Curated annotation (Swiss-Prot):
Entry protein name: Cysteine--tRNA ligase
Any GO molecular function: cysteine-tRNA ligase activity
Cell compartment(s), UniProt: Cytoplasm
Catalytic activity: tRNA(Cys) + L-cysteine + ATP = L-cysteinyl-tRNA(Cys) + AMP + diphosphate
Binding site for Zn(2+): 31, 226, 251, 255
Extent of motif 'HIGH' region: 33-43
InterPro entries noted in UniProt: Cys-tRNA-ligase, Cys-tRNA-synt_Ia_DALR, Cys-tRNA/MSH_ligase, Rossmann-like_a/b/a_fold, tRNA-synt_1_cat_dom, tRNAsynth_Ia_anticodon-bd
Organism per entry: Azobacteroides pseudotrichonymphae genomovar. CFP2
Length: 492
């Protein structure tokens, strides 16, 4: 079977065969968070999406340099060139230093990403640590004639750029329409056109974060950092740039313009974008009173939640939808994910109970594996892989019920199948095992109690046997008598 990965390229609007620029090496850049608030579902989705890509590329034996930036300067409250810096505003409101705000929310972000079992990137550069490089990039764009200085700020000349290149190539935006529909706003009087975007902004005396530049004391525009840092760590040409669909315009469109203006070429071979998260059918946002951060999800403290959901349930919920589809959060959907994941983990843990009953296989685990690889190669189709995991679960349950006979090879292939797809590639952790380092001792203690119960039943000491079962039930254990003795599991 050919193992060829196809990914959807936003730039071309079609799935394309992935071919790395350099043999067995991949450069991957993903836009990370602006760290001024609690990490939420909108942060989890791109992190998990590109974690899956990172894991699979490594599985395919690529050496991956994965760069995910941290925005800690330049992202204004309007998401364009107006308003206050989001981090500076938070610092002012809470009477903190800006880097205190950054460190606090970055720690929270790392904590939640670790809980979601998101692998750390190879490099996690901060925008504020690359001011010199950003100033150098501005100089290059000015020298090429695609930017202009105005009142201490520097703006990218979109109209001039578009005469030679195509501004809007990634997003499908038409510059003529933008020029006709974009009104001139207060605070943009230094621009030649309202659609021009800032490369450098002159700071007011009250602006907390500002640096010395050839044009003024100020700060870089939001779009500049990713062009600068991707170039520094991955070179002028690299394989994949990822992020949320909300970044296609203007952020990623502006990144392309900056790269082309400074170097003459686009610099990225594949653009990948994950879709958005909605809550009960509505866009998530504080103004809609449907904002749920990840800590609230994990501890159940948001009023929209009827219970808490552990991080692996949240990860599994996100992976049940293809990354390019919108995913709608609801308690009903999370509860279904919790139940489904529990079935898969239980089946995996039950494989150890299986024994070979035949030498002639009646199941095709290798076929499931091949179809799952095909699904991964088809633009990371995780929902299809999950459907095959449920198919493997049915085989395990059928074998436990003595309705299907398995060979020794079948049993090993089932173990390998769950290990590769559920744990290695989808990144699920069996939380029952990892939550408590003394799990094995705990399980042995339960087994010992149930062995004592079996002995009590053999001695017809029914009251004592029932007491053990009833007490375990109260503690959250589900006990089932079998022909071979007993089975148990945690029911809550």
């Amino acid at each position: 079977m050919k193992n060829q990965l196809f990914i959807y390229n936003t730039l071309t609007g079609r799935k394309e065969l992935f071919q790395s620029l350099y043999p067995k090496r991949v450069g991957l850049y993903v836009c990370g968070p602006t760290v001024y608030g609690d990490p939420h579902l909108g942060h989890a989705r791109p992190a998990i999406t590109f974690d899956i890509l990172f894991r699979y590329l490594m599985h395919l034996n690529y050496k991956v340099r994965y760069v995910r930036n941290i925005t800690d300067v330049g992202h204004l409250t309007s998401d364009s060139d107006l308003g206050e810096d989001k981090i500076a505003r938070k610092a002012r409101l809470e009477d903190l230093e800006p880097m205190e705000v950054v460190q606090h929310y970055l720690n929270l972000y790392h904590k939640t990403m670790d809980a979601l079992n998101v692998l750390p990137p190879s490099i996690e550069p901060h925008a504020s640590a690359h001011i010199i490089e950003q100033i150098q990039l501005i100089k290059e764009i000015l020298e090429k004639g695609y930017a202009y200085e105005s009142k201490g700020s520097v703006y990218f000349d979109v109209e001039k750029y578009n005469k030679k290149y195509n501004y809007g190539k990634l997003s499908g935006q038409n510059i003529a329409d933008m020029l006709n529909t974009t009104r001139k706003l207060d605070g943009q009087e230094g621009k030649r056109n309202p659609i021009d975007f800032a490369l450098w902004k002159k700071a007011s005396s009250k602006h907390i974060m500002q640096w010395i530049s050839p044009w003024s004391n100020g700060f870089p525009g939001w779009h500049l950092e990713c062009t600068t840092m991707s170039r520094k760590y991955l070179g002028n040409l690299f394989d994949i740039h990822g992020g949320g669909m909300d970044l296609i315009f203007p952020h990623h469109e502006c990144e392309i313009a900056q790269k082309v203006a400074s170097t003459g070429y686009e610099g990225v071979k594949y653009w990948m974008h994950n879709n958005m998260v909605t809550v009960n059918g509505q866009k998530m946002g504080k103004s809609s009173n449907n904002f749920i951060n990840l800590e609230q999800l994990f501890n159940g403290t948001n009023p929209l939640l009827i219970q808490s959901y552990n991080p692996m349930t949240v990860r599994f919920f996100i992976l049940q939808s293809h990354y390019r589809n919108t995913i709608d959060f609801s308690n009903k959907a999370l509860q279904a994910s919790k139940k489904g994941l529990s079935r898969l983990l239980e089946a995996n843990n039950n494989i150890k109970q299986l024994t070979a009953q035949t030498t002639n296989s009646t199941v095709n685990i290798e076929g499931l594996r091949n179809k799952s690889i095909e699904a991964m190669n088809d633009d990371l189709n995780t929902p299809i892989i999950i459907s095959y995991l449920f198919e493997a679960t049915r085989i395990v349950n059928s074998a436990l019920a003595k309705q299907t006979q398995l060979t020794t090879e079948d049993i090993q292939q089932l173990k390998d199948f769950f290990q590769l797809f559920l744990f290695n590639l989808l990144g699920i952790k069996d939380e029952l095992k990892y939550k408590n380092t003394s799990y094995n001792s705990f399980a042995k203690a339960v087994d010992l109690l149930l062995q004592i119960r079996v002995q009590a039943k053999q001695e017809k000491n029914w009251i004592f046997a029932d007491k053990i079962r009833d007490e375990l039930t109260v503690l959250g254990f589900e006990v089932k008598d079998t022909k071979n003795g007993f089975e148990w599991k945690l029911s809550k």
